[in-house]
């Protein structure tokens, strides 16, 4: 049996060597994806995003607010405008993401306790930029009122402790668990890169099986395995499994041990998750081809499954907030279970037993070929390829 397995795997290596699709989809594109996403946000968060100022007060207080806003890491004051219309036009031209409006009489209103209003406008076309700039603009607006209050209380002879107690009666002790730096690279690369690698696995698996029919090699392939479909599939996918596993595990080593992404869960769940992710995607590809023994249909199913995974895995929008039918359908995607295991066992370091249902789901995906593998044998021996 092992001799047959070896010869089938060797035959598959020859096929892969002659077909550049394998080289690009299994090595070049995954490496390019890793480099692209890990360097896309290497600084962690966007910095120096352009902001405009409409200062109609021209006072010491307004200038102080502008200087403080410009000092924030994510904000950079790039221009001043005479009125709201000019600033709005700049947002429409994508020259700035937001602008701060300081109306005339702001400083006088603060000193007279008349509660003047300052306004800020921001674009949420880009969700990350909009939310970060909203935070900075809201903070600077709060600081403006606090600065005036501090000046008045200081003039009345209050101590610094008394001033702080008056301005902030309740102190907030804030802790961001898992990712204290709010590093977007930690969120982006750990989901997008594995998802794209899994998409390549989804596509290559039915492609490699379907081309046996397309190029009239199916009978020879089954003859080498002694008409044993399990042996035929195992030998054919063994080289692909080793290559994809190497790419996947090297990616995980790169982000966790070279780039230093947080992984308090340790190495065991990282390695096990990488192995099960590759095997589950290959198994789904085998299942899809056995369900519909057609190169085009099986690849269409797998591409649909891989692309929808990005929306339904819960990384960008929580699955439990979606409608109940969609939440149930989400469990049919390997990437959903990958993401849940990653954020529970690797990112947060919770025990693996907490994600036992998701580990079991990946194992269940690995057993899917049992349902359709005999249909693959029938297709290889009886069916003819129809372009």
Residue spans for each PLM region:
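Extracytoplasmic/periplasmic domains immediately adjacent to an N-terminal transmembrane anchor
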Residues: 1-186, 374, 378-381, 386-387
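Alpha-helical membrane-protein architecture signal
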Residues: 2, 6-10, 186, 225-226, ...
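Residues that define the loop-to-transmembrane-helix transition and helix capping
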Residues: 20-21, 230, 296
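Hydrophobic alpha-helical transmembrane bundles that constitute the permease/transmembrane domains
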Residues: 23, 27, 196, 241-249, ...
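Hydrophobic alpha-helical transmembrane segments of integral membrane proteins
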Residues: 26-27, 190, 314, 330
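Hydrophobic alpha-helical transmembrane segments of multi-pass membrane transport proteins
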Residues: 32-35, 175-255
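Membrane-spanning alpha-helical segments of multipass transporters and channels
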Residues: 58, 250, 254, 262-387
